[in-house]
Amino acid sequence: MGLLNDTKHEITIEIAPGKTMSIQVGKLAKQAHGSAVVRMGDTVAMVTACEGNPAAFDFFPLTVEYREAAWAAGRIPGGYFKREGKPSEKEVLTCRIIDRPIRPMFPDGYKNEVQVIGTVLSADEKYDPDVLALTGGAAAVWLSSRFPITEPLAGVRVILVDGQYIVNPTYAESESAELELVMAATEKSISMVEGGAFEVPEDKLIEAMEVGHEAIRKIIAGIKQLQGILGIQKAEYVAPVKDEALAARVSALVKDKFLATFRGKHPKTVLYPALEAIKTEAKAALSDIEDPVVLKKAMGYLDEVKRDAMREVILADGIRPDGRAPHETRQAECEVGVLPRAHGSALFQRGETLGLVSATLGTRTDEQRIDSLRGETFKNYMLHYNFPPYSVGEVKRVGTTGRREIGHGHLAERSLAPVLPVPDSFPYTLRIVSEILESNGSSSMASVCGGSLALMDAGVPIKEPVAGIAMGLIAEGDRIAILSDITGTEDHLGDMDFKICGTTEGITGFQMDIKLDNGLPKDILKRALEQARQGRANFLAAMNAALSESRKEISQYAPAILSLKIPEDKIRDLIGPGGKVIRGIQEESGAVINVDDGGNVTISAVARKAGQKAFRMVQELMMEAEVGKTYPNAKVKSITSFGAFVEFLPGKEGLVHISELENRRVEKVEDVVALGDQIAVKCIGIDGQGKVRLSRKATLA
């Protein structure tokens, strides 16, 4: 068979009726510890996985990279260097959807460096390669004996269109989707879901997840088939033997203190120092331990006791660290119009999480240009999320926007998108910026609430206000507590982070990560969604108390944007020879004018009067001469021996014959008018060639 194909194996999986996916191993990147090539249509993604040496970290050092190279779509990148630069937002978001479900597959305590790299090899105009890379990453770590994971995993995209669910849809199918989600799951349980929707009810989300999980099971069956063909035996991870005596000693030192602290109903500003004090006291009590490795192990046992203590208090007493019951949300307060020159602004405080959110209205020239595998597109709505270190009282490097910030911003952005007005009715470019000033969990959800208020404060006519809530879960056997509006501690020590955004009518955005090995039972998922709906209602009420509907007028500091439609055969008249006419209007009015091939004209100006002047000038330019109509401000453009040519409408000239200048005989045209004069004229005729005859004397009393 040759060098390229002697180790190649490939399977084809029908993931839905008439829709297939292939997974190939053994041909490309054979020196990687694991690799898989996944294909749908002509879209192909290759993902590799490599294992390094154990790292001296307190966390699992997994890194995920994903690149959409322009050559995969038969394109050359733009820019001076003509090569791919830093990862795009789409590439960063895809890294996150690969990372989040794969990371929990590895056992606790595993510290070897692992690097997963996804590369798009071919991109057609039908299928998005992101979910192929997700499945490829999961297949790469499973179809290798190096990685000690116990279950294979796969991912799909699901949309809802006209009541039908479609798995791994085409781009065209996705354009009319009411709901879209990307999910990852093992054969038994769902581990990650994220997506957006146009105010769909909760049951539609559950149905979409069930459809997706069924398709994932088919993919996993194919991956297992490949495993059998390759004869791969999975590595077993041998966890370090627990030092029971040391663990018992640590537990005796801190358990009761942790239990008492978590029952103390403390805010974060009290809770965190109290927990740190317990740790400091424990270190002092363990000062006889000289070996730093053993001391580090003891601190690990301490963290386990802390986790168990918080969970026990919630499950046994029904009390959360800040004193709330599981279903209770934190108090929310809102203010709008807090920044004098911002077009719209809001403060949203939820417990100890505070977001300052601004909304800025721009023009068409402010749209973001995106160069992707599908070509160049423009984006007229953006939401940017910033999480400075001072928001949690830390000192860290401030610089490049991190993946977490990009991910949180994307969730908030897509959650607000369904309620925005269509560009035809509101032709502004919108930018929302959320600055997190304080944080104790759910900062991305504060960005959604604050973003909704900032848009309304800016006068953006949104369909409905949107609120977001983060749900958590504590599960130990049959004991389960669903937590509304979780804090940072509950997120870190709990079993679920389920962010749900929506209006009173339905869901607009969501993101779920599950840490449970057996997944989330359907009845618990339903309860969590219902509890989230009730929590959203609390926040919507607080938001409505601050501002119940969009302001009737946009900010005086926002640019004026006016639009009108002109006949397509008049576009050339607006532009003029070499752009002369449109440039003249812009220079005279101070506005900026854009016209597309369909005759849609957009006029933008910093000063409203400038925009209105340009609007009138364009309207006048589109006017046709009417016999019998008087034009009071015609401008003399040129003078001949037989008359004067005047511009009576923008870009339209006519002749005032010398005999039509005065009621008396005129010897010289210059005796009556001069270049640049403005005179009143009346249209007295239009010949067969469209030439306009004008009269000044017809306007004289």
Predicted regions mapped to residue ranges:
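Conserved phosphate/anionic-ligand binding catalytic regions in large, soluble enzymes, centered on
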Residues: 34-37, 44, 127-147, 336-359, ...
